[in-house]
Amino acid sequence: MVTGATMGVAPAGLGARDTLRFEASLCLYGHELDDETTPLEAGLSWVVKLGKPDFVGRAALAGEKARGSRKQLLGFELEGRNIARQGYAVMRGESMVGKVTSGTWSPTLKKSLCMAYVDADSVDAELAIQVRTNPVQARRTPLPFYPSRARG
């Protein structure tokens, strides 16, 4: 730390790392990724090369691409300083149509954001996030939240 002190280097913990991961919309196993979620649902189609020789799961992914995914990972901005946490419900009226995977206050963008999986037939609907017992309006926002790979 002494060597980097003149350049502003300071210790950072897991919270800082997770916030940076979240703002860049990078998937984390146990949140956006699990053994029930496909790469196409997670927005990772760029890593799936269906034109390459056969690989485990190729037929299933080709079928999913042809018919469409059952759910989609979306980004949301919440009203006010409400914070959506993992597991909070995404609501379409009175119906639960998805679940929050990650959410926090973004110190870089100065707003409350979350990522959530939403059923394919509800991705274009008006949605709310159930924060504790209150539905909070959620506006779709493109992923990644902070698109640049470098800070300047």
Which functions belong to the PLM regions below?
Residues M1-G152:
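Conserved, structured C-terminal
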